[in-house]
Swiss-Prot record:
Renumbered residue ranges of the record's region G1: 355-362
Amino acids binding GTP: 355-362, 401-405, 455-458
Region (G4): 455-458
The tr-type G domain, residue ranges: 346-513
Principal localisation: cytoplasm
Gene field: infB
Protein name (Swiss-Prot/TrEMBL): Translation initiation factor IF-2
SUPFAM superfamilies xrefs: Initiation factor IF2/eIF5b, domain 3 (SSF52156), P-loop containing nucleoside triphosphate hydrolases (SSF52540), Translation proteins (SSF50447)
Biological role: One of the essential components for the initiation of protein synthesis. Protects formylmethionyl-tRNA from spontaneous hydrolysis and promotes its binding to the 30S ribosomal subunits. Also involved in the hydrolysis of GTP during the formation of the 70S ribosomal complex.
GO CC terms, sorted: cytosol
One family name in Pfam for this protein: GTP_EFTU
Organism of derivation: Bartonella bacilliformis (strain ATCC 35685 / KC583 / Herrer 020/F12,63)
Ranges of compositional bias, category Polar residues: 17-33, 149-163
Region: G2, residue numbers: 380-384
Positions of region (G5): 491-493
Length: 848
């Protein structure tokens, strides 16, 4: 590029004005919505020495003068010091003046360096802008050539501007005018200022964004700025930021319109899922899923819930694979832990003592344990299931004692399911009884070998042979009768042949070859559970596999907990419980149900999750039983028939869960088609204030079985009029509830025939009405009895006698063959020859 004004450059010169020492510039500011504002700025230029200029250094003077530093606000005029005056100065003053001169030179040098650095930076910026302007002009020229080529090949588009002047020509004309004016202004300036100003103005005026004409295939260029989009005067308004953003998004969308490759995913499907959730797991739009369902004639919304089958069809249709899971999967792996065959060791046998009530099961176990359990049971009958462990010849045997009463059927069935050997106790003087037969059936259903113990052999009326013969009728063949079932004649009272019974048990256990892996995680079954005051939930469990340790986390039914204590059958605290060991555990969050299986889990989170799932499942089942929205016709008819059934509401609190279960089963059998029992609430533990409140709202009777209410609860019950009944024998409880329910039965009407009378004549009596003159043909007539009017052997009226007179006197009774006058209540259609039947109705109380 030439520094002469007449030389041509790649772009036309800009219009400039001569810069004076003080000049006024107008800066035009552009705002949104086409608003502008002009600001007048006055600047003063100072002469700055450029690096390429030759600066004449001042001649050194022989006599120094003091120049004040520029940083001081007060500048004094330098005074020329004559040699005479200098000679009058002291050495201190001369040193001060020399230091001031040196500081002034240092300050000037610093200012000169800063100005040089600033000038270099400005020159580099100007060169960069000039380079960018050259590139812009080159792009503009290329753009113009493309437009000319496209116009020659295609039809000419409708011009956006006036037909007389094209945008390119207007730009060139404006540039020509600006360069002409600039050449006149720059003629009076020196060459250095002209070179500097021309570069600065060139970078501002000629760096313009080329206008884009629609329909061209121009590629994207660099990012535009507002300054480069506007000229120096601001005549044209550039694109807004929103417009530029829209343009970029449109370009991106155009690039992304290429078809993407379908990604197949593995979709995990639970039992139920919403359409929105399914679409998110497939990474599809929920609208597309809705459209697919509409094609299948299923009108649904994104929030609708569908089952796993429909969700699987949708996922397969969209090209994904499916993995179905269930909420019950969380329970997998807690019970089906494989045993290591190399670690299997012999375990003690689990023996269940079964039989009829009062046949001596607990007494036999007492004799074996050398303890007195019967005395602790109310009424002398076993009402709890107990587990004990005894030792015979160095080998342990675990005994489970089950109740023999008819109400404890579920307990006997549970005892047979968890046992290895069943000892059937039959009294020699009583032979086979109903619960004996039931125990045999439970043992056979559980495929458990039976050992028959013929008890009470010491009694004079004992007949062991009769017992063996009656057992044959129920397919129990003892060894003495040619069978395979072991039998032992014992006496729990005298202890006769108890050692033979234990040896028979150990022999049967050896035949069964009972083994277990004691090193795996423990699991087993809950034999009994109760809520103990001061200790919380206490569960009696039987470890079947593995070893149960203190602080283990277990899940039992709907409850979970961390074991805080392990107590054996003797009341001793232990740290571990091996297989076939019955123990009491403390630390459960709630009271589990008797018969629930328990297992040890790894951590609390999993135990809590399993328990919550089981509780939710139990609630859903209860709600389904209660609501029953989809009932069959038979269920609807039964419900209509039971609308008028009276209910006897009960709240049952017991010491252990098994007793409550037995009481509930016994009470459910008491109802008939008119009255039924309704168990509002049942649970193990003492009677609380919440039980009284529930009894008040449900109009129930509170029953405590081996539990009591404290003084606060008793006072609350007395205030609210709630009856609390205490029992410790299940016989008495069932009998009292049966008598109370009998009181709810409507009395039975019994009709007694008294006699017949024939109407001879009808009389009309003032203030009384029609009176029939009758003769008693059979039996007698009593005053206030019921009557039926029979005409031609058809009963046309049934009612009561209003009056009974004989010779104008009121009488209470008229015997056969006598005549009397009879009037009916609210009925007068009587004729001669009709027959009157007299009867008496009696109300008799009914019982269940």
């Amino acid at each position: 590029m030439s520094e002469n004004n007449n030389d041509k450059i790649t772009a036309k010169k800009t219009l400039t004005l001569k810069r004076s020492g003080s000049e006024t510039n107008t800066v035009k500011q552009n705002f949104n919505h086409s608003r502008t504002k002009a600001v007048v700025v006055e600047t003063k230029r100072r002469k700055i020495a450029r690096p390429d200029e030759k600066t004449e250094m001042p001649q050194p003077i022989t006599k120094p003068h003091v120049a004040p530093p520029r940083s001081k606000p007060r500048i004094e005029k330098p005074v020329l010091v004559t040699p005479t005056a200098q000679s009058n100065l002291s050495s201190t003053e001369m040193d001060a003046r020399l230091r001031a001169l040196e500081e002034a030179h240092i300050q000037d040098e610093i200012i000169r360096k800063q100005a040089a650095e600033k000038q270099i930076a400005e020159r580099q910026a100007a060169e960069k802008q000039a380079k960018e302007s050259e590139e812009g002009l080159h792009l503009q020229k290329t753009h113009k050539e493309k437009i000319q080529k496209s116009s020659s090949n295609t039809t000419k588009p409708t011009p956006l501007f006036s037909s007389t002047v094209s945008p390119i020509e207007s730009i060139e004309a404006a540039l020509t005018l600006k360069n002409t004016a600039a050449s006149k202004r720059k003629a009076d300036e020196n060459d250095d200022d002209e070179k500097y100003n021309r570069r600065a103005n060139l970078s501002k005026s000629e760096i313009r964004a080329p206008k884009i004409i629609k329909g061209t295939d121009e590629r994207r260029r660099g990012k535009l700025t507002l300054n480069s989009a506007l000229d120096e005067e601001g005549n044209s308004r550039g694109r807004s930021m929103a417009a530029m953003r829209r343009r970029q998004e449109k370009f991106k969308r155009a690039q992304n319109q290429e078809p993407r490759e379908k990604i197949s995913r593995e979709v995990i499907l639970p039992e139920t899922i919403t359409i929105q959730e399914l679409a998110q797991r497939m990474a599809e739009r929920s609208v597309d899923v809705i459209k697919f369902l509409m094609k299948q004639e299923q009108m649904m919304k994104p929030g609708d819930v569908i089952d796993a089958d429909i969700a699987e069809l949708i996922a397969i249709e969209f090209g994904h694979t499916v993995k179905r899971v269930s909420e019950s999967d969380i329970e997998e792996g807690i019970f089906n832990v494989d045993d290591d065959p190399q670690k299997m060791k012999t375990r003690p046998p689990i023996v269940t003592i079964m039989g009829h009530v009062d046949h001596g099961k607990t007494s036999l176990l007492d004799a074996i344990r050398k303890a007195n359990v019967v005395s602790s049971e109310a009424g002398g009958i076993t009402q709890h299931i107990g587990a004990y462990q005894v030792e015979q010849n160095g080998q342990k045997i675990t005994f489970i004692d089950t109740p023999g009463h008819a109400a404890f059927t579920a307990m006997r069935a549970r005892g047979a399911q968890i046992t290895d050997i069943a000892v059937l106790v039959v009294a020699a003087d009583d032979s086979v009884m109903p619960q004996t037969i039931e125990s045999i059936n439970h043992a056979k259903a559980a495929n458990v070998p039976i050992i028959v113990a013929i008890n009470k052999i010491d009694k004079p009326t004992a007949d062991a042979q009769k017992v063996r013969t009656e057992l044959l009728q129920h397919e129990v063949f003892v060894e003495t009768m040619g069978g395979e079932t072991l039998e032992v004649e014992v006496s729990a009272k005298t202890g006769q042949n108890l050692d033979k019974l234990l040896e028979a048990i150990l022999l049967q256990a050896e035949i069964l070859d009972l083994k277990a892996d004691s090193e795996r995680t423990a699991d087993g079954i809950v034999i009994e559970a109760k809520l103990d005051q001061g200790r919380g939930s206490v569960a009696t469990v039987l470890v079947q596999k593995g070893t149960l340790h203190l602080s283990d986390i277990i899940v039992a039914g709907n409850e979970w907990g961390r074991i805080r204590a392990l107590i054996d059958d003797h009341g001793n605290h232990i740290k571990t419980a091996s297989p076939s060991t019955p123990v009491e555990i403390l630390g459960m969050q709630g009271t589990p149900q008797a018969g629930d299986r328990f297992a040890v889990v790894a951590h609390e989170a999993k135990a809590r999750e399993i328990a919550e799932y089981r509780q939710r499942l139990a609630r859903d089942k209860a709600a389904a039983r209660k609501t029953g929205s989809r009932s069959s016709l038979e269920q609807m008819m039964t419900k209509l028939q039971t609308v008028g059934v009276k209910e006897f509401s009960l709240i049952i609190k017991g010491d252990v869960q098994g007793s409550i279960e037995a009481i509930t089963a016994a009470l459910e059998k008491l109802g008939n088609e008119e009255v039924q029992t309704r168990i509002v609430h049942s649970g193990a533990g003492g009677i609380t204030e919440s039980d009284i409140s529930l009894a008040e709202t449900s109009n129930s009777v509170v029953i405590g079985f081996n539990v009591r209410a404290n003084k606060q609860v008793r006072d609350l019950a007395e205030t609210q009029g709630i009856e609390i009944r205490y029992y410790n024998i299940i016989y008495d409880l069932v009998d009292d509830i049966k008598a109370a329910m009998s009181g709810l039965l409507s009395p039975e009407k019994r009709e007694t025939f008294l006699g017949n009378a024939e109407i001879l004549e009808i009389f009309n009596i003032t203030k009384i009405g029609k009176v029939a003159g009758c003769q008693v043909t059979e039996g007698k007539i009593e005053r206030g009895a019921g009557v039926r009017l029979i005409r031609d052997n058809i009963v046309i009226h049934e009612g009561k006698l209003k009056t009974l007179k004989r010779f104008k006197d009121e009488v209470n009774e008229v015997q056969i063959g006598q005549e009397c006058g009879i009037a009916f209540e609210k009925y007068e259609d009587m004729r001669a020859g009709d027959t009157i039947e007299i009867f008496r109705v009696e109300h008799v109380n009914r019982t269940l």
